[in-house]
């Protein structure tokens, strides 16, 4: 049976550019000599951003190590630092980053790795690796620094040696930034995948054990007081592997994602930590059965999501009950949803407003977002309103009174079908072979484009 998946995109032209909405590509980097992993063929992983000496920097991880670019002027971006990983090669899937007060902290979750600390305060002129050892930790999945307290939260920490060498969460004190010291360990769950922390109140993404909200403000190496669990959430719409999340600046709302195909992101009201409430769900709008969010960050009223196979997505959550799509850019060309591929990380906090994205297969991107641009997509509930039904066997109808011109292009960009002056008629595309197509619709001198997958 043929099946059509549709998403509507407003473009000024078709061309050979990636699918995008209100997004301008300012810089793209990838290095074909860097090998991909044996698991997911990803040469790249996390992205982070930094500002020092009035310069903007992008940090991206690879199977080789850590690459730092000066992206102050994106059109002439250059790599200004490279830190080789303690372990390298096809087994290295994850690296993660956070910086504080001139120091960049680096972890890796595979191989014979180390905690790496880099003095980046003199970039772009110089940098200095001040710590590179496995004596504190050998591997970790993610890290987050609570800037208000200078505490480093290490998720799923593995230490060297045998025996009890794993901590679901380990908190370190960064009073000495070049030599973190033990502050507290938390092992109430099997593991913590990721964390968002503000003033030592932590939102912990605990995989299949859901979300935990924990107060660590009264703990320390010389204090007998233990942590205080403020709330949890294990049963909610599209519950799966609770993967990551971010809070709004006022702390009233929290957006989280479950790393499962077909699972949508959730916006939570967390004004009462003891009773977090899911207000709405949303996703890219492309494939309700297969699309999968990875990492998301909230800045002002927008959620920026690295949405794996679908690329970068930006949603306006001014009204948390009705998130609206603002922009997107497809960083991953293939149309399949196999495994874990595509956009990995996103960083929206640079003073310029430019947004950094890392793609597992295609590398580093710097984007400019047009927040005032026109969009014909407001949210996922409206993405199927121009042509329907969806799914479809290729026989489509429209509520538009007139489509002046319809053109269908295959993956190579070849024009394979044209229809003119369609008026409340069925659109028969059942003759097309299974595959990926781009359809251009001209309606009242406006051009719309849509992705069409016929299966």
Question: Residue spans of the language-model regions?
Answer:
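Feature marking well-ordered beta-strand scaffolds used for ligand recognition
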Residues: 17-374
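Residue-level detector of functionally pivotal "anchor" positions at catalytic/ligand-binding pockets or at interdomain
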Residues: 368-388
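C-terminal outer-membrane/trafficking sorting elements
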Residues: 6, 381-455
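Intrinsic low-complexity/disordered segments
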Residues: 15-17, 447
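A short, polar/charged loop/turn motif at coil->beta-strand junctions and beta-hairpin connectors
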Residues: 17-23, 41, 379-383, 392, ...
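Hydrophobic alpha-helix-in-membranes signature
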Residues: 11, 275, 322, 388-390
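Sec-dependent N-terminal signal peptides
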Residues: 4-13
């Amino acid at each position: 049976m043929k099946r059509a998946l549709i998403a509507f995109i407003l473009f000024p032209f078709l061309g050979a550019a990636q699918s995008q909405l209100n997004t301008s590509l300012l810089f793209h980097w990838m290095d074909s000599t860097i090998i991909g992993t044996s698991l997911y063929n990803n040469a790249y992983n996390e992205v982070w951003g930094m500002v020092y000496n009035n310069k903007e920097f992008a940090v991206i991880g690879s199977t080789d190590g850590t690459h730092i670019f000066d992206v102050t002027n994106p059109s002439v971006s250059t790599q200004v630092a490279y830190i080789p990983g303690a372990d390298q090669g096809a087994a290295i899937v994850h690296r993660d980053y956070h910086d504080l007060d001139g120091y960049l902290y680096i972890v890796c979750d595979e191989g014979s790795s180390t905690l790496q600390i880099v003095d980046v305060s003199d970039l772009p002129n110089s940098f200095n690796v001040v710590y590179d050892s496995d004596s504190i930790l050998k591997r970790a999945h993610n890290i987050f620094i609570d800037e208000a307290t200078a505490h480093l939260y290490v998720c799923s920490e593995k230490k060297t040696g045998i025996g009890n060498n794993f901590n679901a969460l380990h908190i370190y004190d960064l009073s000495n930034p070049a030599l973190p010291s033990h502050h507290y360990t938390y092992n109430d769950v099997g593991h913590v995948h990721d964390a968002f922390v503000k003033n030592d109140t932590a939102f912990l993404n605990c995989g299949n054990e859901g979300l935990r909200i924990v107060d660590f403000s009264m703990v320390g190496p010389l204090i007998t007081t233990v942590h205080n669990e403020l709330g949890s959430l294990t049963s909610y719409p599209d519950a799966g592997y609770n993967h990551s999340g971010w809070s709004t600046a006022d702390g009233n709302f929290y957006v989280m994602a479950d790393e499962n195909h077909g699972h949508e992101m959730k916006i939570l009201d967390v004004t009462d930590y003891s009773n977090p409430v899911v207000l709405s769900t949303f996703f890219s709008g492309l494939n309700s059965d297969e699309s999968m969010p990875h990492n998301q960050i909230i800045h002002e009223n927008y959620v920026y999501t690295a949405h794996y196979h679908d690329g970068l997505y930006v949603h306006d959550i001014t009204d948390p009950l009705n998130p609206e799509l603002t922009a997107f850019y497809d960083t991953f060309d293939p149309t399949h949803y196999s495994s874990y591929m595509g956009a990995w990380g996103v960083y929206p906090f640079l003073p310029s407003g430019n947004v950094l994205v890392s793609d597992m297969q295609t590398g580093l991107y710097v984007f400019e977002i047009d927040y005032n641009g026109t969009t014909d997509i407001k949210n996922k509930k409206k993405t199927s309103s121009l042509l329907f039904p969806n799914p479809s066997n290729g026989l489509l109808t429209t509520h538009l009174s007139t489509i002046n011109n319809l053109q269908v292009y295959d993956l190579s960009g070849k024009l394979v079908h044209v229809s003119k002056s369609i008026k409340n008629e069925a659109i028969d595309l059942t003759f097309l072979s299974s595959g990926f197509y781009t359809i251009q619709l001209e309606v009242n001198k406006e051009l719309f484009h849509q992705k069409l997958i016929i299966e």
